[in-house]
Amino acid sequence: MQQLSKRRLSALFVTAFLPVTAFASECSSVRFAEVGWTDITVTTALASEVLEALGYEPRVDTVSVPIAYAGIRNNDFDVFLGNWMPSMASISDPYIERGEVERLVANLEGAKYTLAVPQYVYDAGVTSVNDLAEHADQFEQRIHGIEAGNDGNEL
């Protein structure tokens, strides 16, 4: 009687975990959307190393922010680690509100956009935003933003 119970228990144990192992075999790769920014490249590389050590096969594709979100919605990507909040709200919130993308946790809080100039421009007198108007001709009255489609260009 004791042996029969062990067999049944073993069968129950194996049966209970079959769906889990089937699911795990379907999830052997993790597809990252990455936007080519130094910080996100490093964050994605670190996450990829950890996942490789756990037996997963990470794949990283460099795309723009809008394509990253559309790719998650379309199941082309699993993860995007470059969501800057609140500055990316205009891109991410519609996907989140429709339940197409889930924001799990923040890996960077309080992110903001700001202007930067090369040292030679700073040395020429552009040390704050207020100096831009005075030197506007040197910049053809233009400020260049980040990649196309990024909401930071709207600021």
Swiss-Prot record:
The UniProt keyword set, sorted, is:
Signal
Q: Which GO terms describe its molecular function?
A: transmembrane transporter activity
Query: Which Gene Ontology CC terms are recorded?
Result: ATP-binding cassette (ABC) transporter complex
Q: Which residues form the signal peptide?
A: 1-24
InterPro entries named among the record's database cross-references: ABC_Gly_betaine_transp_sub-bd (IPR007210)
Q: Does the keyword Signal apply?
A: yes
> What is this protein's record name?
Uncharacterized protein ORF1
Q: What is the protein's species of origin?
A: Chromohalobacter salexigens (strain ATCC BAA-138 / DSM 3043 / CIP 106854 / NCIMB 13768 / 1H11)
